Amino acid sequence: MLPNRKPPRPSPSFQSLNNNNQRFPLRRSLKIAQAHSLPTVPSEDAKDDDLITPELSTDFDFREIQHRYLMALQNEQDGETTSTDDAFFELDDDDDLSSPSVPGSPVDPPSISVPLPPKSAPPCPTQPAPLTNGDLYPTILSNGTPIPNGRITPALSTVSVSLIHEARLQQSLSTPCNGSEEEMHNGQVRKESEYRRFKSEGSTAGASLPAAEKTHMDELSPVDQRSTSGTARFLIQQDSVVNPSTKMSNTEQVAMMHTLKTKLSKYQAMMDKAFEEIAKVEDANIIEGCTIVRKLMRKVWNTPKVSADLANALCDYLRDRDYFDKLIKMFISPNTAACDQVRMECGKVLEECTSSANLEYIVNKSYTKKIMIVAMKLNKTPDQQRLSLSLIGNLFKHSNAVSLSLIETDVIDHIILTFKRAPECPDILRHAALALANILLYTCFEGKKKIIQKKIPEWLFFLASQADDVTRYYACIAVCTIVSVKEFEPLVRKSDTMKLVEPFLQVHDPATFARDYHKYAQGNTKEWLERLLPMLQPSRRREARSVAAFHFTLEATIKKEQNKLDVFQEIGAIQALKEVASSPDEVAAKFASEALTVIGEEVPYKLAQQVPGWTCADVQYWVKKIGFEEYVEKFAKQMVDGDLLLQLTENDLKHDVGMISGLHRKRFLRELQTLKVAADYSSVDESNLDNFLMGLSPELSVYTYQMLTNGVNRSLLSSLTDEMMQNACGITNPIHRLKLTQAFETAKHPDDVEVAMLSKQIDVFISYRRSTGNQLASLIKVLLQLRGYRVFIDVDKLYAGKFDSSLLKNIQAAKHFILVLTPNSLDRLLNDDNCEDWVHKELKCAFEHQKNIIPIFDTAFEFPTKEDQIPNDIRMITKYNGVKWVHDYQDACMAKVVRFITGELNRTTPTTKEMPSISRKTTQQRWQTTNTVSRTGPSRSIGGPRMEPPTPTFTPTGSQERATSTRRKIQPSASTTSDRN
């Protein structure tokens, strides 16, 4: 007799198939064994709930049972009843049976009258043998591989046992028969238990109800959810373009539909009960009912595979039963104002239930602006502000006309004001980025123009600099949506936000990124993807193509789980992705190739970004790709490679290639110039000449290769004459020659020229510690740019090998140096006598070049207790005046920063009168030395040289307006990245 031990957990390879429903209770196992005359192996003290598997005979074949199951389903659809021999498929776990047969009784193979299944049916193992742990494993696999002594190796265990469980899964997916009254009652008890759990968790109104049984909700479902983790669920398991497995098996599709049908019926009943509670009108009952619906919808959005279909079906059910309309009326009703919690709970349900169909209902019923007005009034608490932004973002996902009508209100100002005053609330910042992304995707040219006037590109820089990945991601999508419009590209470039896009994409995996937000983890709608599709066009900026390709890879991973990959063919994304995948854009091509692999499409030929190394075949492919297929043979005949392609002139195209049409030549040269700017010359450019020309003006990069082939490097630039530029370097445009000439007027050394050019682009350099000061530094940058200052902040990567000099040149070029001091920002420079820390290097450079240093102190910052730990060359910073930053009074803080910049407050070098009165122990002690404040009328005059925290009554002088009016127009500010953590 075998010991009564439970079998081990199945291997992960078939865990998603058996769904934990493949083990049978004792009674069911015995009845199945009796129905097929199979011997059983009961344990000595077996109980009803013990898990045990019947021992199968040598001639037993699971393919036969699988085929019988399919025949039973067909008969059921045709109105026929199955025979009693098919009891294997009709039994429930709760069926009561008599005592089992004796284990040693003779066994006859089951007689099956139906024909055998086709050869395409999955192979099944035979001759299982019991092991010491109570499991049954086959001694001979279907391929004839023998297993000595009935033992199975780990390598074979997954294959063989998964086949058994797959067969059992198909058995469990048959349409359930009408059970007995007792069974129906048991099912009702299960639903009641789950309903009570929703009602009791996290709600005070239902505290008097009996507590629900402590059972995980997944255990109450007829078909359990997959037990794989969220991370594993989104991993791309396909890294080859050969026969990609993009389609679900029939078993998985049946399981998915069964799960959807079962859960939908159960959740609809729970919705009805929740709204019965809401119908009682009392505030406590309304809150209780809304809490149940909200938690239910939150669970639905987290359901694997079927979440989108299940959620949309429940949203339709709410609308069809007038529940959705009732929620809207309670949310916008003036009577609800008496109880903010009722309005909040109604709003949270609307947040989860605003599907495309329900949004159409809102628009048709003219509820849009009413909901918008009420949502904008939710601004008292962080939870209200989060809900406000979430509802606003959902309302924009309808059409251009609706979006434009909403933009004409103060909604953009409301969004900016909400997240501007909550920089330390990740949820608010996340929903702000989501709202702006939806607004920009669902609005027309006129709407985008109005948004640009609100300085949204600058604010997107702040959102794209946050620690939360979802916030950064949707901020990148939003800014790329704006820059896709050619007319807005110059304005967006000035904000520096575009420089944050590709560095973010390069360190993230689209396959695992979607899980970070429950509602967006199941993908966006077809209409949303259609609006993103134009960003893949070759005429768009490189960053826009990269973020679009990233998102389509993310969506492909999700849609594959949902078996909805056809949507990409329907919207025409396949061809667009193939074009991007074959382009020289490294980041965009990488993600486009991944998307095509997941979808199951062939990845096209990939061109390298190192154009000088292209072969003749590469050039011919590129010529065909840009639309000049009729000239491919001419390029092949002339054996044009990457080197010759970069040196082609209009005369070469006309006489050697035979491109007679002048318009054809112009269009070809336009594509060639774009290629020259995007090309990577690092293999032939040792002096970083291309980087220098790009820093002066991106359009000068088209001359890089011809200058390199003629032996020009950075050290020779100052010696070039106008004639040499025109003849040797090929700079035929006189304006371009003038730009280079002006760059060398103030200095002859290339480094001095670079500083001189940077001084025309930078007013303020911001130094900060990335680990703690990133958010505050990015906020200060945006606020300064809005006041007309050109700001440098090190957020982008510098070229390898030139990091030190390039960063310090920006400090030399700037007139003002802002040091953002946040908690622990000086810890890494303590006792740094070798000047290895980057904040130390930056501050030392600012002192050496006598910059106007302005410290900005976070409220939690404190100077080190021992002053001698700070290196001597920067120790003077402890005696500098500065601004204490308080987020509630940002305008007052920034006004004081402007006064430091304009010189109205004392300059950076401390006076001898100030030094004796300075105590250097902590910032808090320094602030305790308050100054005398005299009030005259509504204004304040602040005396004394020490720092004072800004207050709501602080009134800045008119210097800000005077300074802004005299400043030059905002210019794009350079940026870089350093190891500042």
From Swiss-Prot:
Would you name any one GO CC term?
Answer: cell body
Q: Does the keyword NAD apply?
A: yes
User: Which reactions fall under this protein's catalytic activity?
Assistant: NAD(+) + H2O = ADP-D-ribose + nicotinamide + H(+)
Q: Polar residues composition bias: which ranges? A: 12-23, 74-85, 908-939, 954-963, 972-981
Gene3D superfamilies recorded: Leucine-rich Repeat Variant, Toll/interleukin-1 receptor homology (TIR) domain, Transcription Factor, Ets-1
Keyword presence, Oxidoreductase: no
Ranges of Basic and acidic residues compositional bias? Answer: 182-200
Q: Which GO terms describe its biological process?
A: antibacterial innate immune response; cell fate specification; cell-cell signaling; defense response to bacterium; defense response to fungus; defense response to Gram-negative bacterium; NAD catabolic process; negative regulation of gene expression
Pfam families linked:
SAM_1 (PF00536), SAM_2 (PF07647), TIR_2 (PF13676)
Residues reported to bind NAD(+) = R769, R770
Out of the domains of life, which is the source?
Eukaryota
Q: Which EC numbers characterise this protein's activity in its record?
A: 3.2.2.6
**Disulfide cysteine pairs (residue numbers):** none
Q: Where is the composition biased (Pro residues)?
A: 115-128
Segments of this protein annotated with the region Disordered: 1-31, 74-128, 173-225, 908-981
PANTHER family recorded for this chain? NAD(+) HYDROLASE SARM1, SARM1
* Designated name of the protein: NAD(+) hydrolase tir-1
Organism annotation? Caenorhabditis elegans
